From Swiss-Prot:
Lineage: Eukaryota, Fungi, Dikarya, Ascomycota, Pezizomycotina
Any Pfam family the entry gives: ParA
GO cellular component terms attached to this protein's record: cytosol
Gene name in the database record: NBP35
Name of the protein in question: Cytosolic Fe-S cluster assembly factor NBP35
Source organism: Coccidioides immitis (strain RS) (Valley fever fungus)
Keywords assigned: 4Fe-4S, ATP-binding, Cytoplasm, Iron, Iron-sulfur, Metal-binding, Nucleotide-binding
HAMAP family documented for this protein: Mrp_NBP35 (MF_02040), NUBP1 (MF_03038)
Subcellular location: Cytoplasm
GO biological process, one term: iron-sulfur cluster assembly
Binding site for [4Fe-4S] cluster 2: C256, C259
Record keyword Lipoprotein present: no
UniProt keyword Cell inner membrane, yes or no: no
Length: 342
């Protein structure tokens, strides 16, 4: 049986058991009905839920040990973050997953936590698939023999249905993705997140903290409008105790396939990602040039790096993947052999 939004007892029941029953929507700056500040924060004053939240049981989340045990067979957990939307974060996630999975000895999972804007299934050409429940838990959708995906998209009755949820429901589904999905033994679990620093990010960090996260890869474009939000993302990671594996500058230029001349489409008005990484004291993983065929490959669910291995973007991506593998303690030559990388 496949869980869906038409079957709330299957899809959402377990995730919402511990949450107190509220009588009104949470205010804008609600600390969360399950947080230590529930019913005590400034935003709680005058809220109809204040007494309910204040009297709700507090303490360690009993699901955390279950999540830790469930994920104990996953060697590396990598978050992909961006401050600004539209910088190619989900595209980079799909490329990173495909690159890791290009080694037949590696098994890779992708968890799409962009609840309101899931795009990973489209990029992986599994948009019409559904997930199924077995005795072991929810089964992810397998793109290939060694690449699996889990996304809210698989639970939508119709592809274009909007997910209009507040924080607690999003948090509950993310918890269920971590607690109930039978990932099995993975070498890499890559977590794609929505832009910014929202409920989804806080939930992923709190649920994964005990099981160990290798770190986060931040994605930006060269212009200051994007870098401005990346600085906030860096601050979030530091406050949340998330190791920053490095910064990737996406769409850094366009290399003409005829003359190989590089043009700056998004000019780095303040120095771009490289200077930001140096100023903020984080690793710079590299610059990936713009290639219109990346978007086309994502639309058709194709593996861009396999189809266009000679593209400057593919070459740059391979270098980034090798650097990330080194950051998490793996031998780059085993992850992406030198014969396949430039």
């Amino acid at each position: 049986m496949a869980p869906s939004f038409e079957e709330p007892t299957v899809a959402l029941g377990a995730a919402s058991k511990a949450a107190p029953k509220l009588v009104a929507p949470e205010p804008e700056h609600c600390p969360g009905p399950e947080s230590e500040q529930a019913g005590k924060g400034d935003a709680c004053a005058g809220c109809p839920n204040q007494s309910i939240c204040a009297s709700a049981p507090k303490g360690p989340d009993p699901d955390i040990p279950i999540i830790t045990a469930r994920l104990s067979s996953i060697r590396h957990k990598i978050l992909v973050l961006s401050g600004k939307g539209g910088v190619g974060k989900s595209t980079f996630t799909s490329l990173l997953a495909n690159a890791f999975a290009s080694n037949p000895d590696s098994t890779v999972g992708v968890m799409d936590t962009d609840i309101c804007g899931p795009s990973i299934p489209k990029m992986m050409d599994v948009e019409t698939e559904t997930i199924h429940v077995s005795n072991a838990g929810w089964n992810p959708v397998w793109v290939s023999d060694n690449l699996a995906v889990m996304s809210v998209q698989f639970m939508l009755p119709n592809r274009d249905d909007a997910v209009i949820w507040r924080g607690p429901k999003k948090n509950g589904l993310i918890k269920q993705f971590l607690k109930d999905v039978e990932w099995g033994e993975l070498d890499y679990l890559i977590v794609d997140t929505p832009p910014g620093t929202s409920d989804e990010h806080l939930s992923v960090n709190s649920f994964l903290k005990e099981s160990g996260v290798d770190g986060a890869v931040l994605v930006t474009t060269p212009q200051e409008v994007s870098l401005l939000d990346v600085r906030k993302e860096i601050d979030f990671c530091r406050k949340a105790g998330i190791r920053i594996l490095g910064l990737v500058e996406n769409m850094s230029g366009f290399v003409c396939p005829k003359c190989t001349h590089e043009s700056q489409i998004f000019k780095p008005t303040t120095g771009g990602g490289g200077r930001l990484a140096a100023d903020m004291g984080i690793p710079f993983l590299g610059s990936v040039p713009l290639d219109p065929r990346v978007g086309m490959a994502c639309d058709y669910g194709e593996n861009f790096m396999d189809r266009y291995p000679e593209s400057p973007a593919s070459m740059a991506l391979r270098k980034v993947v090798r650097t990330i593998s080194r950051q998490v303690g793996e031998d780059p030559d085993e992850v992406l052999p030198e014969t396949d990388a430039v």
